[in-house]
Amino acid sequence: MLIKVKVFPNSKREEVIKKSEDSFEVKVKEKPEKGKANREVLKVLSSYFKIPESKLRLVKGFKKRNKIFEIK
């Protein structure tokens, strides 16, 4: 299953907002440098979906706000 994620780094709090069945907004506190925000998004999404991080994979958008994740 693929999901679309719009990431908001440098946020005051971490949260996941569901926009549609396969579209989410994720706010994280980390800065978008050296993959820190991407790693934090993985943690937040795994907590939201209640699955291990190993079941999530960033497919597209490594250096962009709009990303596509695969849930295995």
PLM regions and their residue ranges:
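Absolute protein N-terminus
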Residues: 1-2, 72
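Active-site-proximal or metal-binding-adjacent scaffold patches in catalytic folds
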Residues: 4, 12
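Compact, glycine-rich, soluble single-domain proteins
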Residues: 6-8, 22-49
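A generic beta-sheet turn/junction motif
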Residues: 9-11, 62
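A structural signal for short hydrophobic beta-strand segments in well-ordered beta-sheet cores
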Residues: 16-17
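C-terminal structural segments of small proteins and small subunits
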Residues: 34, 40-72
